A protein has these predicted regions:
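N-terminal helix-turn-helix DNA-binding module of bacterial transcription factors
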Residues: 1-60
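Bacterial carbohydrate/catabolite-sensing allosteric modules
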Residues: 43, 84-89, 137-144, 148-230
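Structural motif
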Residues: 93-114, 214-230
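N-terminal helix-turn-helix/winged-helix DNA-binding helices
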Residues: 2-4, 42-80, 89, 99, ...
């Protein structure tokens, strides 16, 4: 038997395809109509194509999430709790891994918009002007995590305070030879504000900020820099 379609279900139930679409999208239907469609769906074990449905409906119930990588602790935990929260609100998560490539992140923003997702959650590691122009060019709400975006919604961490307080704690414990290992200022939150928090704490103790070490997000390079400077 060929794969069942919405058209087939509509014919069997004696309703229009719009009514069947409304059933799958959780729209209002008469009780008997809903039960009739459900009986057919259950009988043939029919599962709607979420992405095909998304392209045809106003409400896709899909949220695209663009992460810089899949192997980091932060990305993994962020995805875990985002997916949990979204599923509790009847949304599906579509994950795109940019592998620390800004061009890929920008490409995925446009790709997800073409797929008619209801929203995009973005974890950027750089903040170039290209993000602003790309986000403004699409008609999909975008939320940035971890970076400030004046032109869109953003959820930020206070990297400056976190780094300053941590450094203050280390210095107050009697340690004076402090090194900072961070990324470049292309990542404004982590590369600039976090480093600035460390420097301000060192200044409070009249210490020079000479051990400022810059790396990328890769574990191997970070390991080598630490090994060379111990």
């Amino acid at each position: 038997m060929k794969k069942l379609t919405i058209v087939d279900i509509a014919k069997m139930a004696g309703v229009g395809t719009t009514t069947v679409s409304r059933y799958f999208n959780g729209g209002n239907l008469k009780k008997e109509t809903r039960e009739r469609i459900k009986e057919i769906v259950d009988k043939y074990n029919y599962t709607p194509n979420t992405f095909a449905k998304a392209l045809k409906s106003t409400d896709s119930k899909i949220i695209g999430v663009i992460v810089p990588c899949l192997h980091s602790y932060i990305s993994g935990n962020t995805l875990k709790y985002l997916d949990k929260e979204l599923k509790e609100n009847n949304y599906e998560t579509l994950i795109m891994n940019a592998n620390f490539d800004e061009n890929k992140q920008l490409e995925y923003i446009k790709k997800l918009a073409r797929m008619n997702v209801d929203g995009i959650i973005l974890l950027p590691t750089t903040m170039s002007k290209a993000y602003e122009s790309t986000i403004k060019s699409i008609d999909v709400p975008v939320v940035m995590l971890g970076q400030e975006g004046e032109y869109t919604y953003s959820v930020e961490y206070n990297d400056f305070n976190a780094a300053r307080d941590l450094t203050n704690y280390v210095l107050a414990s009697g340690h004076k030879k402090v090194a900072y290992l961070g990324v470049s200022e292309d990542d404004v939150a982590v590369g600039y504000y976090r480093k600035l928090g460390v420097i301000r704490a060192l200044e409070k103790y009249n210490l020079e900020s000479k051990n400022i070490l810059i790396t990328n997000f890769g574990m191997e390079e970070g390991y080598e820099i630490v090994r060379e400077n111990i």
